[in-house]
Amino acid sequence: MSAPKHVIIIGASGYGRSILWMLREDSAYQKDWDIKGFLDNRADIEGLPDVPILGDPLSYKIEPGDIFINALGSPADRRTYTAPLREQDADFFILRKNLRLGERATIGLGCIFDDNVSISVDAQIGRFVTILGSSIIGHGVKIGEFCHIGNFVFCGGDAVIGNDVVIHPHATILPRVKIGDGAIIGAGSVVVANVPAGVTVFGNPAKRFEFK
């Protein structure tokens, strides 16, 4: 029997603590793995009495049995704070609470799937993607790396989502729509046409949006 893993959560603020709660509800908790602590370098963030902050994710040296989960919402932050750990060949946890995964669908290393996410057949989910509760990913959808998809999002069949994309809650991506790298989809938007890389869209139908 292999030794249990020691889970380290990157990010000790609100979402990190939500991830801690989800991990503790998992049936494998304290059987296959335990919780070692948080990694966080923000001076105003404190650990919990039973879950300390172990150090800075940019300088932490991996110890035997460590396995990591990235609880940072921003794709840019997720890239930044996983990079030094990936350079050390860190192992990353896949959290999949009540995930419904279709035939031939694939999911990448370090993904987080909140409660009741549904991924249909032949979908491909890249590394370090976060998909929050009750979102539906249609058949053949391709999602790149480090994306963040909010609650109650629907991605229609064969849509293509680039890397580092943020899709806010209750958005709908119509079938076969392509969304470029780094695009942002506003809450409640209905995306009926392709979205270029780095563009923010909002509304129904979704149109280019700029903060003034």
Regions found by a protein language model. Name each.
Residues 94-209:
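Structural signal for interior beta-strand "rungs" in well-ordered beta-sheet cores
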Residues 26-46:
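NAD(P)-binding Rossmann-fold cofactor-contacting core
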Residues 23-27, 85:
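Active-site catalytic pocket residues across diverse enzymes, especially alpha/beta-hydrolases
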Residues 15, 44, 207:
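Conserved Rossmann-like nucleotide-cofactor binding loop
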Residues 4-23:
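Glycine-rich adenosine-cofactor-binding loop
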Residues 43-101:
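Phosphate-bearing ligand-interacting subdomains
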Residues 9-10, 39, 71:
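Short hydrophobic segments within beta-strands
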Residues 1-9, 133, 145:
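Glycine/serine-rich loop-strand microenvironments at binding/catalytic pocket rims
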